[in-house]
Structures are given as C-alpha cells and as structure tokens.
C-alpha cells in the first residue's frame, strides 16, 4: 500500500539562511512543503524565492510567540511584541482568545496578499495551535476556509470534536529534531508511522544555512545537519523503497 509523505519545513521567512535552506531542501532533496511566518523579518525574501520554486507547497505558520503581531494584542504582547510567556498565560487560563482569533484572520489575509493564493494548510510556531484553548479556534477557521491543518494527535484529547470537513494527515511527527539528526532517525520515523498504520504522514523539519539570525536560535547547527540529511540521494531511495510517495497537504 502506497503511503503519502509530507516533509514540511517550518519557519519560511524567519531569515535568509532559513529561506535558502528550505529552497535547497526542496530543489535537491525531499522537502515538499513549507510554512511561512508572515511577520518574519525575511518574509519578502521568502516570497521572492518561492516564485522560482512552483513545486513547493506553502502553508501558513501562525505566529503568537515571536515578533510583532499584525493586530493590537494588549493581552498577549509585552512592549508591543509576542513572546514565550504565552505558556504562562495558557496555564493560568488567561489567553486573550478574541485577540488570537482576530490575529489569525489578519495573518491569513496577509499571507494571501504576500503569496497571491491561500495557504495549503495551517500550523504554528512552537505548536501553540495545539493549546487546548487555541486549537478549536484554529480548527474551525481551517475548516471554514477549506484548508488543511497540522494535528499532533498525541496531546489532543478532544479529537472527536473536530469539524467534519477538516483535512489533515493521519500522522504527524516532530521527532526529526535535536542533536542526533541522521538518515536513520528519519527512516525510523517512517517505520514507526507504518507500524501505526498511518496512510499519510507529515514530518516536520527545519533545514537552514547558518546566518546571524539562526546563530541566535537555541536550535542552530542541527538545522544545517537536517539540510544535509534531507538532500541525501540515498534517503530519497529509502523512502520510495518503504512505499511512500512524496506530496503535500494538497494531496490529503
């Protein structure tokens, strides 16, 4: 049985080094999909590069933890910027859900302005769309707009409440991440999904060339290792040998 594999590179628009890495991993590797941060400092550069890579499916990386929001968010920003204190607000059940709803719609419209089309799917920076308070908002929005959504089903307790017309892959893995990146790790992710019986799988990745922005990230040099693995000719062969075909959320 043939299975669908979506290799999605997060953080398109984060920096020029990130953008170049994603394009390289698409052009000469197995990356088929990416998600863009519309408030990223290099988003215009990402848009420009994407015009020469029509095969790259582009979704939206909803941002609530970095940079400036597109709308007024006094309940979530500090000194006008977003940050990781969103976790504390979530634990205190103090998230400004109306502000988040408005920001989601604004980022979505901005994506369409930038790329000239709808995103193929939605996910989020630091997986904040999987917060129990935020997930219903994003799931409903994706269903209404007719676009797919990344769903990590492991922390999801209300899977039965998903909109009937919401599209997603059967499986999702964030395991291709960290200091032990290798071809063997990527293939183990596929084998684990096969054992679960997933007919479609998204694997998250972050391939990049190192620049000054990436150097400031807590996750820096492994991005370059990811790029090396994702452009390996032997990996592409091993994926096909396991019965997977590369695709995007347009195939879900």
Curated annotation (Swiss-Prot):
Its cofactor is Mg(2+). It catalyses: N,N'-diacetylchitobiose + H2O = N-acetyl-beta-D-glucosaminyl-(1->4)-D-glucosamine + acetate; diacetylchitobiose-6'-phosphate + H2O = N'-monoacetylchitobiose-6'-phosphate + acetate. GO terms for cellular component: cytoplasm. It is an enzyme of class 3 (hydrolase). The keyword Nucleus does not apply. Its EC number is 3.5.1.105. Keywords: Carbohydrate metabolism, Chitin degradation, Cytoplasm, Hydrolase, Magnesium, Metal-binding, Polysaccharide degradation. InterPro entries: COD_ChbG_bac, Glyco_hydro/deAcase_b/a-brl, YdjC-like. Mg(2+) binds at residues 61, 125. The keyword Zinc-finger does not apply. One of its GO terms (molecular function) is metal ion binding. GO terms for biological process: chitin catabolic process; diacetylchitobiose catabolic process; polysaccharide catabolic process. It is found in: Cytoplasm. It comes from the Bacteria. Pathway: Glycan degradation; chitin degradation. Homodimer. Involved in the degradation of chitin. ChbG is essential for growth on the acetylated chitooligosaccharides chitobiose and chitotriose but is dispensable for growth on cellobiose and chitosan dimer, the deacetylated form of chitobiose. Deacetylation of chitobiose-6-P and chitotriose-6-P is necessary for both the activation of the chb promoter by the regulatory protein ChbR and the hydrolysis of phosphorylated beta-glucosides by the phospho-beta-glucosidase ChbF. NCBIfam families: PRK02134.1. Belongs to the YdjC deacetylase family. ChbG subfamily. This is Chitooligosaccharide deacetylase. It comes from Escherichia coli O139:H28 (strain E24377A / ETEC). The gene is chbG.
